[in-house]
Amino acid sequence: MFLLYEYDIFWAFLIISSLIPILVFFISGFLAPSSKGPEKLSSYESGIEPIGDAWLQFRIRYYMFALVFVVFDVETVFLYPWAMSFDVLGVSVFVEALIFVLILIVGLVYAWRKGALEWS
């Protein structure tokens, strides 16, 4: 039998944990100064006023490499616990991990074919 009142603590926790960040966001908006001085609008590099233009545009290649790195970094995070408990989990989990790795390899091949890994 499913009793809804058994989950009252969960719903209270969910509502409170959702309201606290929203309240903090709105309170900081009301208490923050509305006008920004010239110091807030100037660039700041290690305590020294920058010489020349401080805004540099990065090439999109940096972002592509960073994106591929993040994908494979997350893969490592998911595969490490699986590798540590491989002998306990069995063959079905091995097949699931193999499918996961194959999907990532397909993504790598796609990025490679699109030229995301070429620097020139």
From Swiss-Prot:
Its main location: plastid. It is a multi-pass membrane protein. GO terms for molecular function: NADH dehydrogenase (ubiquinone) activity; quinone binding. GO terms for biological process: photosynthesis, light reaction. It catalyses: a plastoquinone + NADH + (n+1) H(+)(in) = a plastoquinol + NAD(+) + n H(+)(out); a plastoquinone + NADPH + (n+1) H(+)(in) = a plastoquinol + NADP(+) + n H(+)(out). The chain crosses the membrane at residues 9-29, 64-84, 88-108. Pfam families: Oxidored_q4. The keyword Zinc does not apply. It is found in: Plastid, Chloroplast thylakoid membrane. GO terms for cellular component: chloroplast thylakoid membrane; NADH dehydrogenase complex. Its EC number is 7.1.1.-. Keywords: Chloroplast, Membrane, NAD, NADP, Plastid, Plastoquinone, Quinone, Thylakoid, Translocase, Transmembrane, Transmembrane helix, Transport. NDH shuttles electrons from NAD(P)H:plastoquinone, via FMN and iron-sulfur (Fe-S) centers, to quinones in the photosynthetic chain and possibly in a chloroplast respiratory chain. The immediate electron acceptor for the enzyme in this species is believed to be plastoquinone. Couples the redox reaction to proton translocation, and thus conserves the redox energy in a proton gradient. Belongs to the complex I subunit 3 family. HAMAP family: NDH1_NuoA. NDH is composed of at least 16 different subunits, 5 of which are encoded in the nucleus. This is NAD(P)H-quinone oxidoreductase subunit 3, chloroplastic. It comes from Guizotia abyssinica (Niger).
